[in-house]
C-alpha cells in the first residue's frame, strides 16, 4: 500500500476529525475523482476528500450511483491519492465502497474492503446503511480499516425509495435513524454522513454521537459538511438542488473559453508566433 501521503506533517486523520468535533471546529469535505482536482482541493485546505460513487453520475453520466464498479472506484481513488500526495498531503482521502461490494456477505465485504485499501493507499472507506450493515462495519474496522457511515438518503438504495426526497420526516423513520447512528458508532465507525434529513434530527444525532457527523442537505448543526465539487463550481447547469451553494459558474466560463478557442483556430489566430517553435 502507498501510504506516503499519510506520513506528511499535518495529514488529517480520524483522530484529528474527532479532535475537531470536540473543539467545535467544523469539518470541510468535498468530492474529487481525478488527480488535478485533488491537488486543487488539497492546496485550498479541504479537510477530507471523498472519492464518491457519485463519479457514476458526474464523471460517467449514469442516472444513479449503482453502475460504478470496484475497479472504477479504484481507478478514481488512485488518481486522487496521487494528487493529494503531490500537493501538501494534508487532506484525508475517503473512498465509497460501491453498490453490492459489501452487501452480499461479511466475508466478501472484508475482501473487497482490503482490495480497495491495498490498491490505492486511501485513508478510509464509506459504507451506506445502518443496522443491516453494522456487523460488516465492525468486521472491517476490527482489521484496522477505518469506516465512515452514511444514513438518511442513501443513493445506493434509490430504487427502494423511489425518489430523492428528504428522509426521516416521520417519527418511525427518525427513530430508526437514531438507532442506526448509535449502532454505527458502536461498530467502530469514525464518522457518519447524514444526507437529506431534517435539520432538527441531524442536530439530535450530532449531539448524541461522540463521532463527527457530516451533513449534506442536513442543516447547519452537523460537525461538518460535504458537497459534490462539480455542484459548488457550477459545472452542471441543469442541477440546482436546494442544499447546494454554488460558489462559481464554471460552466459558463468553460463555454466561453472553448468558443474563443474555436474562433481563434478557425480564424487562424492560434497559434501565434510566440506560441510556435
Swiss-Prot record:
EC number of this enzyme: 2.1.2.11
GO cellular component, one term: cytoplasm
UniProt GO MF annotations: 3-methyl-2-oxobutanoate hydroxymethyltransferase activity; magnesium ion binding
CDD domains, A to Z: KPHMT-like
Cofactors (names): Mg(2+)
Binding site for 3-methyl-2-oxobutanoate: 53-54, 96, 126
Pfam families (alphabetical): Pantoate_transf
Function description: Catalyzes the reversible reaction in which hydroxymethyl group from 5,10-methylenetetrahydrofolate is transferred onto alpha-ketoisovalerate to form ketopantoate.
Similarity comment: family membership: Belongs to the PanB family.
Protein name: 3-methyl-2-oxobutanoate hydroxymethyltransferase
Organism listed in the record: Chlorobium phaeobacteroides (strain DSM 266 / SMG 266 / 2430)
Gene: panB
